[in-house]
C-alpha cells in the first residue's frame, strides 16, 4: 500500500476490506472473510452435491470415476471444487507465478457472492448441464479479463451467462473453451515436466470445510499459468491429481467433526454457522475459530500469499508476515489455538472413520498440507521437485498412497499430513501445539498403516498415463516399487522443504516418540537438505554443512530412494552435531580474529597528529619544516585543518578515467587456494578449446563473445569461479540448482549485488560456459588436473623464481601518467609520459634498433624469444604473477555505483575502519576467495582539481590548496614547471579494499594528500631509516632468490604490518578522515587501504634538504634502467640559473656540490667518447647565429617530429638533458654512458653524432658562479674542477631566451659564434 492510501477514509462499506484500514489489519480481515466465504459457498453447493459423498464411500468408486476419470463425469466437478478449496496451499508449490501479483480492482468482481453481502444472488447450477457440478469443470486458473468481468456482472444469475463463466474464473479464450475432460486426459503426461515453470512466492492455505471447494483452486491455477503454455498444460494435470487430495481432506475432516458419515450435511451447516459468527466477530475486532476451518488459521496464513488476484483469494493475498494490532493479535492467537486443537482431534477421528474409502475421500488432502508447512520461498524452489517425485510415486505402482499422481504417497490421513508437516514450515517457529499434535498423530500412524496399504493397493492400476519426468523423478520412478519404498518416498518428499531442521542447531519436534513401522521411517520431520530452501538468515550456512551431511550418509536403502539431483544422500534422522559446528566455529574464529586484530594494531605505533591554528595554517612548507625532524622518524604525519577551513570539492561527475582492477587476494602471495582452483579450471577449459583470461563479470553487458569479462560500467562484479563451483556442488549439482531454481540463492551466496542487470541469467550463462564441464569431471580427473597445475607452478618458480618477483612489462601502463615538461627541445609535452606509439616512428625505431644492435643484442633477443616461448608453454600460469590489471574508461558516477555495489558484496552495512582492515588482511593472507576492486588515478590538469581554482572562490589562493602548493616559494620543484604526476596534483579515486601497495617514491619526493570526501583511508608507514632492514626482511619472507627485497616490494606486494613488526621493523599506522591531510616525508615506505568510496588529491613538493636524496635516487634509477618522471640534470641547472640571480645562498650551497659532480661526470664522458672516435658533434639551439631565420625555416626539421619521450636513452631510460648521442638515420638515442659502451663494443662510430646543450665553457661558468655565491661569506673559492674557471660574462635578455631550444639540422662541428649564454 502506498502512503497516500489512507486518504480514502471510507469505511462505511462493511465488506469492503480494502479501503480505510492498514495493510496488516486488512490481511487479517481477508483471512477470516475467506474462511467464512468458503463455508458459505460450501453450504450452498452442498445442496447441489448431495450425491458426491455417497459415491465416494466405495473404496474404488471415486478413484475410478471421480478422481482418475473425473474429466468424463460429474465427479470431476467435485474434484475440481475440492481442489480449488483444499488445494489452495498446493498451488504454492506447483504454481508458476514468480513475481508477487499485484492487487487489481477487478478482484472485487471476480466472484460476487463470497465477497458480497448476503443478499447477493446465489449462483445456481445450469439445469441444462448433465449434473449440477459439471459447469464448475470449466473454471480456469487464468487471470480474468476486464471484458469477462463486465459480461459476468451483466449476465450473472441469468441463463444467458455462458456456462464457462457461471462461477467466473476463465475467459473465453480458445484454450479455455476446449473440453476440460479432453484436456486433462491429453495433457496429463506433462504434469511433472512442467511443474516448475515458475516459482510462486507464497502458498495459500487449505480451506477444508466439507470436501467441496468454492471453485477456487483450479480457477486460480489457470490464471497463474496463463503466461506460459507449458504451465497451462501442467495445471490441468495438477487439477486432476489434486482432486483426490482435497476430497480426502474434506471427508476425513467431516468424519472428525461429525458422529458418522451420514451426518455430514448437518456438520456442514454447523460449520457454516460458526464461520458466520467468526466473520461477525472479526468485524467487531474479535476473532474465533470454527471446527472445520483450522487450515485457514491466521498463523498458517501469515507466512503465505496467494498469487491470484481475484476476490476469492483476498483472504490470502498478502506477502510476508502479518503485523497485527495488539487486539487482533490476541484474537488471532485464540483462533490459531482453536484450529490447532480441533485439527488434532479431527485428524485422528477422520483417520479411524474414513480410512475405508481412501480411494475417494482420504486422498483429498494429498499434497496440500506440506506446501503450507513452509514459506513461499521454500515452496518456490521445491515446486517442481516435489510435484514430479510425488507424481511418479503415485502413477507408478505406489501402494501406500491413495492418489495416483503422487500427492499422498503414503500419507494416511488429512490430519496426519497437517500435523506432520506443520513443524517444518520455513521461517516460523514450531509451536508446542504442533509438536504435541504431531506426536499424537504418530501413535495412530502405525496402527492404521496396514489398513491404508490394503485399500490403496488398487490405486496403482488406475488409468493414468505416466508423464515424462525429470532426472530426479525418473530415478524415483524406477525405485518406488514396493510399499516400503513408497512410504520412504513419502517422507522424503514430505520433508523436502524444512530448512529449519537443516540449518538449526537441533531438529524440531517430530514423531519419533511414537513407534514407527519399518515401512514408515520415523523421520517425517527430517528434511532432505538438497530440496529445501533455507531462510534468508540461514542461506549462508548451507555451503558449510552440505558436505558434512553428505559424508554422514550411511543408509543405502534410503539412499536408493533419492533422486539423481539430490544434494544430500541421507534420510537418517537429522544429526544436529553436523549443523552448528561450522557456524559456531566460524563465529569463534571471527571473534578470535577480531581480538588478534585489536592486539596487532595496538602494537603499531601511531603517527603524530597536528592541529594548527588558523594563524599557523597559512604556509604549509613553513609549518611542516617546524616539526620535520620529529616526524621523519615515523615517515608521515596527519594534519587536521582548522574548523573554518573546508573547501568545497567540485568535481565533474561525468569526467572519465581508466581504472585499475586490483585482485586483492593476490596482493600478498600470488598463489593460493582460490588461484590454484581457478588455474585448474582454466587449464581444463584450455583443453576444451575455451580461453578465459579473466573471471567473468556480472553486470550490464559483456564485451566479447569468448570471454565477456570486460569491465562493466554498472554493477560490474567479477565472479569468483572457484567458489561458484563449490557452491553449486554444495547445493547438489547443476541439475538440482536448475530444478529447484536456486540461482537467486547462488547469486546471494556469491554476494553479487541485485543491482547488476540480469544477474541470474548471466550467472547461469557463466556457469554453463566455464564451469559445467569442469564440475562433471570425476574425482580422479580433478586430482590429476590439480597435480599437473602444481607441477607447472613449481617448474615455473624453479626457472624464474617466486611469482611475486616476475617482471610485468605492462606495469608502467598502470601507474600514474608521467608527463615530460616543456624543456626547450621542441616546445611539446608528451601525452602520457611514455613512448607515444605512433605507427611510423615506431616502425622506424624498431628497424633502427635491429640494424644498430644486430650483434650486441643477438643473445638478448634469443633470450627474449625463449622467454616468450616459455610464457606460451606456461599456458594458464603465464599471468599468475599479475595482480593489477588495466580496467576500462568509466565516469565518476559509474565508479561510484561500482563502489557502492562492491561495498554491498562484502558488508551488510557501512563498516568501520577496523572492520575493513581486519577483512582486508584476512583476504590477503588466506587467499581463499576472489576479490577484485577498482582504483583510479586522474590527472587534474585534464579533468580539474577538487580544490577551488577560480580567483573569486574561497580558498582558491590558500597555501594549503594543493593546486597552489607547487608554486610555493619554498618548494624547489617549481623550477620544473608543470609536470603532471609531480607538480600537477592528481586524484586518487578508490573504493573499499582499493590499495596503494608498499612503495617509496622513486625520486624520494615528499608529498601531501588531502581526502576530499568519502570513507576513511588507512595509512601504514615505515620510515626511511628502516630501509636496509626492510630489504633483508622482504627478501627472506618472499624467498627472493637473488632479487633485492625492495625490488620485490615494488612489484605490488602487500605484507601485513603485523608480520613486519614481528621481524623488528617499525611500522606506524593512522586513519585519515575526510577533510584531513596526510604528509609523507622523503624516503618513507607507505601503503594505503581505502575503507569505501573516497576521493583524495595528492601533489609532490620538495625542500632544499631533499636535493641530496633526490640526486642519489636519480643515479639509482639510471643504474636500474627505470624511467624517471623528470630530469634531475635539468632541475639542478634550472635551480642554479634562477637562484644565482636571487642569491639564495641556502639553496646554492645545497646544490653546489651536486652541480660540480654533475659537471665532472659530463665532461669526462664527452672526453672518453671523443677518444673512442666519436668526432661528429652538434649543439642544438633555437637557430644558428650564422644563418638568418628565413634560411633556418627552409631547412628540413628532421628532429621536430620526435616527441620528448624519444629523448630517453633506449638502453637505460635515462632522460637526456645536457647531451646525448643519436643515430641520425634511425632516430635512436643514447645517453653518453650507454653510447660509450656501444662504441667500445663495436669499435665503430659510423652514423653516430653527439648532441649537446651547453658547451664546456658554459658549464664551468655556471658552476663557478654558483660556488662563488654560496661561499661568499667565507671569502674562499673551493670550486675546483677539471675545467678552467672563468668569470661569467654578462648576457642580455635576448640571449637568455636561448634556453628555449628546438631541434634543427646542425653542422658537423659547432659554430664558433654560437656561444649561448646561461643565466
Swiss-Prot record:
JmjC domain boundaries: 954-1118
PROSITE patterns the record matches: ARID, JMJC, JMJN
Stretches with biased composition (Pro residues): 505-515
Bias (Basic residues): 1-11, 98-107
GO cellular component: chromatin; ESC/E(Z) complex; histone methyltransferase complex; nucleus
Record text about domains: The ARID domain is required to target the PRC2 complex to its target genes.
Protein's UniProt name: Protein Jumonji
Amino acid at each position: 500500500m502506498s502512503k497516500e492510501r489512507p486518504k480514502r477514509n471510507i469505511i462505511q462499506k462493511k465488506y469492503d476490506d480494502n479501503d480505510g484500514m492498514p495493510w496488516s489489519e486488512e490481511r487479517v480481515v481477508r483471512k477470516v472473510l475467506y474462511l467464512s466465504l468458503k463455508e458459505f459457498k460450501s453450504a450452498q453447493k452442498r445442496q447441489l452435491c448431495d450425491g458426491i459423498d455417497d459415491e465416494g464411500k466405495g473404496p474404488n468408486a471415486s478413484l475410478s470415476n471421480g478422481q482418475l476419470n473425473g474429466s468424463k463425469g460429474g465427479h470431476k466437478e467435485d474434484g475440481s471444487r475440492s481442489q480449488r478449496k483444499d488445494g489452495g496451499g498446493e498451488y504454492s508449490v506447483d504454481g508458476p507465478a514468480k513475481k508477487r501479483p499485484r492487487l487489481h480492482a477487478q478482484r472485487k468482481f471476480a466472484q460476487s457472492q463470497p465477497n458480497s453481502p448476503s443478499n447477493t444472488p446465489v449462483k445456481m447450477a445450469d439445469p441444462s448441464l448433465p449434473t449440477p457440478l459439471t459447469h464448475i469443470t470449466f473454471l480456469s486458473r487464468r487471470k480474468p479479463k476486464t471484458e469477462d468481468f463486465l459480461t459476468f456482472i451483466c449476465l450473472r444469475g441469468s441463463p444467458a451467462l455462458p456456462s464457462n463463466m457461471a462461477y467466473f474464473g476463465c475467459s473465453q479464450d480458445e484454450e479455455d473453451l476446449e473440453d476440460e475432460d479432453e484436456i486433462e486426459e491429453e495433457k496429463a503426461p506433462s504434469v511433472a515436466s512442467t511443474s516448475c515453470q515458475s516459482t510462486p512466492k507464497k502458498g495459500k492455505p487449505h480451506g477444508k470445510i466439507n470436501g467441496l471447494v468454492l471453485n477456487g483452486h483450479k480457477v486460480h491455477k489457470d490464471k497463474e499459468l496463463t503466461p506460459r503454455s507449458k504451465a497451462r498444460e501442467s495445471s490441468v494435470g495438477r487439477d486432476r491429481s489434486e482432486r483426490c487430495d482435497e476430497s480426502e481432506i474434506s471427508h476425513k475432516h467431516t468424519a472428525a467433526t461429525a458422529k458418522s458419515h451420514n451426518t455430514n450435511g448437518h456438520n456442514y451447516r454447523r460449520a457454516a454457522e460458526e464461520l458466520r459468527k467468526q466473520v461477525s466477530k472479526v468485524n467487531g475486532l474479535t476473532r474465533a475459530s470454527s471446527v472445520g476451518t483450522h487450515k485457514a488459521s491466521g498463523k498458517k496464513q501469515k507466512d503465505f500469499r496467494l498469487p491470484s488476484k481475484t476476490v476469492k483469494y483476498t483472504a490470502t493475498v498478502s506477502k510476508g508476515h502479518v503485523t497485527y494490532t495488539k487486539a487482533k493479535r490476541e484474537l488471532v492467537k485464540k483462533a490459531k489455538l482453536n484450529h490447532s486443537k480441533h485439527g488434532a482431534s479431527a485428524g485422528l477421528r477422520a483417520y479411524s472413520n474414513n480410512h475405508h474409502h481412501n480411494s475417494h475421500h482420504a486422498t483429498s488432502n494429498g499434497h496440500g498440507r506440506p506446501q503450507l508447512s513452509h514459506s513461499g520461498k521454500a515452496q518456490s524452489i521445491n515446486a517442481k521437485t516435489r510435484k514430479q517425485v510425488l507424481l511418479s510415486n503415485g502413477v507408478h505402482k505406489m501402494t501406500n498412497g491413495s492418489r495416483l499422481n503422487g500427492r499422498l504417497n503414503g500419507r494416511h490421513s488429512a490430519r496426519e499430513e497437517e500435523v506432520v508437516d506443520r513443524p517444518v514450515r520455513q521461517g516460523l517457529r514450531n509451536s508446542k501445539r504442533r509438536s504435541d499434535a504431531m506426536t499424537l498423530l504418530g501413535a495412530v500412524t502405525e496402527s492404521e498403516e496396514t489398513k491404508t496399504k490394503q485399500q490403496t493397493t488398487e490405486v496403482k492400476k488406475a488409468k493414468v498415463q505416466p508423464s515424462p519426468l525429470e532426472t530426479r523423478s525418473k530415478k524415483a520412478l524406477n525405485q518406488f516399487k514396493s510399499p516400503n519404498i513408497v512410504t520412504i518416498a513419502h517422507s522424503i518428499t514430505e520433508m523436502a522443504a524444512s530448512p529449519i531442521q537443516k540449518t538449526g542447531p537441533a531438529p524440531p519436534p517430530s514423531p519419533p516418540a511414537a513407534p514407527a513401522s519399518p515401512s514408515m521411517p520415523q523421520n517425517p520431520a527430517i528434511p532432505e537438505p538438497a530440496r529445501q530452501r533455507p531462510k534468508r538468515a540461514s542461506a549462508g550456512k548451507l555451503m558449510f554443512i552440505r558436505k558434512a551431511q553428505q559424508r554422514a550418509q550411511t543408509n543405502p536403502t534410503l539412499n536408493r530412494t533419492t533422486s539423481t539431483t539430490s544434494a544430500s544422500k541421507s534420510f537418517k534422522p537429522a544429526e544436529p552435531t553436523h549443523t552448528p559446528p561450522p557456524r559456531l566455529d566460524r563465529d569463534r574464529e571471527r571473534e578470535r580474529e577480531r581480538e588478534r586484530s585489536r592486539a596487532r594494531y595496538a602494537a603499531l605505533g601511531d603517527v603524530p597528529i597536528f592541529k594548527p591554528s588558523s594563524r599557523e595554517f597559512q604556509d604549509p612548507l613553513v609549518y611542516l619544516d617546524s616539526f620535520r625532524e620529529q616526524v621523519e622518524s615515523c615517515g608521515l604525519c596527519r594534519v587536521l585543518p582548522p574548523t573554518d577551513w573546508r573547501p568545497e570539492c567540485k568535481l565533474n561527475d561525468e569526467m572519465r578515467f581508466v581504472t585499475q582492477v586490483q585482485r586483492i587476494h593476490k596482493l600478498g602471495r600470488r598463489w593460493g587456494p582460490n588461484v590454484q582452483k581457478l588455474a585448474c579450471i582454466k587449464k581444463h577449459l584450455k583443453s576444451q578449446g575455451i580461453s578465459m583470461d579473466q573471471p567473468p563479470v556480472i553486470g550490464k553487458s559483456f564485451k566479447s563473445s569468448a570471454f565477456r569479462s570486460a569491465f562493466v560500467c554498472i554493477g560490474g562484479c567479477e565472479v569468483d569461479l572457484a567458489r561458484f563451483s563449490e557452491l553449486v556442488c554444495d547445493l547438489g549439482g547443476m541439475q538440482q540448482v536448475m530444478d529447484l531454481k536456486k540461482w537467486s540463492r547462488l547469486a546471494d551466496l556469491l554476494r553479487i549485488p541485485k543491482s547488476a542487470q540480469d544477474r541470474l541469467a548471466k550467472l547461469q550463462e557463466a556457469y554453463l560456459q566455464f564451469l559445467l564441464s569442469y564440475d562433471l569431471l570425476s574425482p580422479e580427473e580433478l586430482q590429476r588436473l590439480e597435480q599437473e597445475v602444481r607441477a607447472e607452478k613449481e617448474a615455473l618458480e624453479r626457472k624464474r623464481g617466486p611469482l611475486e618477483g616476475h617482471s610485468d612489462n605492462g606495469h608502467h601502463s598502470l601507474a600514474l601518467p608521467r608527463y615530460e615538461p616543456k624543456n626547450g627541445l621542441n616546445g611539446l609535452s608528451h601525452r602520457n609520459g611514455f613512448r607515444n606509439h605512433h605507427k611510423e616512428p615506431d616502425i622506424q625505431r624498431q628497424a633502427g634498433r635491429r640494424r644498430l644492435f644486430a650483434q650486441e643484442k643477438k643473445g638478448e633477443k634469443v633470450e627474449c624469444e625463449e622467454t616468450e616461448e616459455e610464457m606460451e608453454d606456461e599456458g594458464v600460469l603465464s599471468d599468475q604473477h599479475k595482480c593489477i590489471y588495466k580496467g576500462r574508461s568509466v565516469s565518476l558516477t559509474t565508479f561510484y555505483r561500482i563502489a557502492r555495489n562492491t561495498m554491498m558484496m562484502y558488508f551488510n552495512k557501512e563498516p568501520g575502519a577496523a572492520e575493513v582492515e581486519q577483512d582486508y588482511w584476512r583476504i590477503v593472507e588466506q587467499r581463499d576467495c576472489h576479490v577484485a576492486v577498482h582504483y583510479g588515478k586522474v590527472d587534474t590538469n585534464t579533468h580539474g582539481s577538487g580544490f577551488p581554482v577560480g580567483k573569486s572562490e574561497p580558498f582558491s589562493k590558500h597555501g594549503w590548496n594543493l593546486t597552489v602548493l607547487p608554486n610555493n616559494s619554498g618548494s624547489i620543484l617549481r623550477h620544473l614547471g608543470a609536470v603532471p604526476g609531480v607538480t600537477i596534483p592528481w586524484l586518487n579515486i578508490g573504493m573499499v579494499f582499493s590499495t596503494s601497495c608498499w612503495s617509496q617514491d622513486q625520486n624520494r619526493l615528499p608529498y601531501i594528500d588531502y581526502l576530499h570526501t568519502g570513507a576513511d583511508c588507512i595509512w601504514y608507514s615505515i620510515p626511511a631509516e628502516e630501509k636496509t632492514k626492510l630489504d633483508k626482511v622482504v627478501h627472506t619472507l618472499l624467498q627472493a632468490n637473488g632479487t633485492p627485497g625492495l625490488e620485490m616490494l615494488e612489484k605490488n606486494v602487500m605484507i601485513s604490518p603485523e608480520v613486519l613488526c614481528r621481524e623488528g621493523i617499525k611500522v606506524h599506522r593512522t586513519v585519515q578522515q575526510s577533510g584531513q591531510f596526510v604528509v609523507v616525508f622523503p624516503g618513507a615506505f607507505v601503503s594505503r587501504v581505502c575503507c569505501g568510496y573516497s576521493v583524495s588529491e595528492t601533489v609532490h613538493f620538495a625542500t632544499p634538504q631533499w636535493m641530496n636524496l633526490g640526486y642519489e635516487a636519480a643515479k639509482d634509477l639510471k643504474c636500474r634502467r627505470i624511467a624517471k618522471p623528470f630530469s634531475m640534470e635539468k632541475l639542478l641547472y634550472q635551480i642554479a640559473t634562477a637562484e644565482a640571480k636571487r642569491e639564495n645562498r641556502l639553496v646554492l650551497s645545497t646544490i653546489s656540490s651536486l652541480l660540480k659532480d654533475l659537471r665532472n661526470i659530463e665532461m669526462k664522458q664527452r672526453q672518453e667518447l671523443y677518444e673512442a672516435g666519436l668526432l661528429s658533434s652538434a649543439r642544438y639551439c633555437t637557430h644558428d647565429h650564422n644563418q638568418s631565420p628565413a634560411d633556418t625555416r627552409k631547412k628540413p626539421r628532421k628532429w621536430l617530429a620526435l616527441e620528448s619521450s624519444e629523448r630517453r636513452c633506449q638502453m637505460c631510460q635515462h632522460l637526456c638533458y645536457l647531451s646525448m648521442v643519436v643515430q641520425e638515420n634511425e632516430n635512436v638515442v643514447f645517453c653518453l654512458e650507454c653510447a660509450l659502451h656501444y662504441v667500445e663494443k663495436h669499435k665503430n662510430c659510423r652514423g653516430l653524432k653527439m648532441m649537446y646543450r651547453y658547451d664546456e665553457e658554459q658549464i664551468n661558468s655556471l658552476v663557478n658562479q654558483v660556488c662563488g655565491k654560496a661561499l661568499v661569506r667565507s671569502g674562499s673559492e673551493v670550486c675546483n674542477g677539471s675545467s678552467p674557471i672563468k668569470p661569467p660574462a654578462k648576457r642580455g635578455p635576448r640571449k637568455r631566451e636561448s634556453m628555449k631550444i628546438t631541434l634543427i639540422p646542425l653542422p658537423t662541428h659547432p659554430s664558433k659564434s654560437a656561444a649561448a649564454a646561461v643565466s
